[in-house]
Swiss-Prot record:
GN (gene name): miaA
Catalytic activity: adenosine(37) in tRNA + dimethylallyl diphosphate = N(6)-dimethylallyladenosine(37) in tRNA + diphosphate
Free-text function comment from the UniProt entry: Catalyzes the transfer of a dimethylallyl group onto the adenine at position 37 in tRNAs that read codons beginning with uridine, leading to the formation of N6-(dimethylallyl)adenosine (i(6)A).
Protein name in UniProt: tRNA dimethylallyltransferase
Leader peptide range in chain numbering: none
EC number(s) recorded for this UniProt protein: 2.5.1.75
The species this protein was found in: Burkholderia pseudomallei (strain K96243)
Binding-site residues, ATP: 17-24
Length: 324
């Protein structure tokens, strides 16, 4: 963004954080003080029928405060970062035009990165390249492809799990098609004529001062999901002929582990432990993304008054009192 555009840009507050950091509570608390509308930055919340395992805001919460980009895609379909970016920019403009305040809230850092920095004309998916990578993975395993990625794009590999097949494949595909690492392409600044050029995104990040506290929350939340009927939710999805574990929706944390349990591949205790471990790994990757944002305003999500602190930080951003 040029200095001229930066001076005239409209500030957009963003509430980011890992799983179980208290984003929903803080967003709803802010909504009690200001006329906000929440734009979800969460790749799992877009899917219909996936409510318990994604910790989707309740009907009452969504009735009290307008939420956007939730329940917009069938689990059999894909939803890309490019689609999110276009939808989010449109919604930010529409919400502001109504005289209300948009609040971006979520934990899908790739979406946030795409929104704020653009996609820089990343190439479209190439079926032939993907088929080759799938064959390589079938022969060598995704950890081997992750190691390959680390050799050409260490920054991207560092934030991906060795079995994150979808993102490893995409990062390798981008490199094979462009000859450039995805991290370099994403780091390029957006053009001044980009739709986001008139916006200044300011992230407030909920981060743990004590990792063990967040881990305990993750375990408690996963157990609460199980008690709320998560296995039944996955069983309903599993009965659909058009859903399978290769889909992005079924790669969401917890869903794969529950599906494998229903397939008889693991017992209940192992499923629970794997679900909690996968969530902790997701949290680790989310924090890696956040800590690469020097402009963020950090709020300790482990503090007893974390919600109050987060609301105060967001109000400072919206009132123009946050650091430039």
């Amino acid at each position: 963004m040029s200095e001229r555009n930066a001076a005239s840009a409209r500030t957009v507050a963003c509430l980011l954080g890992p799983t179980a950091s208290g984003k929903t509570a803080a967003a709803l608390a802010l909504a009690a003080r200001r006329p906000i509308e929440i734009v979800s930055v969460d790749s799992a919340l877009v899917y219909r029928g996936m409510d318990i395992g994604t910790a989707k805001p309740t009907r009452d919460e969504r009735a009290a405060v307008p939420h956007h980009l939730i329940d917009i895609v069938d689990p059999a379909d894909a939803y890309s970062a490019a689609e999110f970016r276009a939808d989010a920019l449109r919604l930010v403009a529409q919400i502001a035009a109504r005289g209300r305040t948009p609040l971006l809230a979520g934990g899908t850092m790739l979406y946030y990165r795409a929104l704020t920095q653009g996609l820089n004309d990343l190439p479209a998916a190439d079926p032939d390249v993907r088929a080759t990578l799938d064959a390589d993975a079938a022969r060598d395993g995704w950890p081997a492809l992750h190691a390959r990625l680390a050799g050409i794009d260490p920054a991207t590999a560092a934030r991906l799990a060795p079995n994150d097949s979808q993102r490893i494949q995409r990062a390798l595909e981008v490199y094979l098609l462009t000859g450039q690492p995805m991290s370099a392409l994403l780091a390029a600044p957006p053009r001044d004529d980009d739709a986001a050029a008139g916006l200044r995104f300011v992230p407030v990040a909920l981060e743990p001062s004590e990792r063990a506290v967040l881990h305990a929350r993750i375990a408690a939340r996963f157990d609460a999901m199980l008690e709320a009927g998560f296995i039944d939710e996955v069983e309903r999805l599993r009965r659909r002929d058009d859903l399978h574990l290769g889909l992005p929706s079924m790669r969401c944390v917890g869903y794969r582990q529950a599906w494998e349990y229903l397939d008889g591949c693991t017992d209940y205790r192992t499923m629970r432990d794997k679900g909690i471990f996968a969530t902790r790994q997701l949290c680790k990757r989310q924090l890696t993304w956040l800590r690469a944002m020097p402009e963020r305003i950090v709020v300790d999500c482990c503090a007893p008054d974390a919600t109050v602190r987060a609301v105060d930080a967001l109000e400072r951003v919206l009132d123009g009192r946050a650091p430039a």
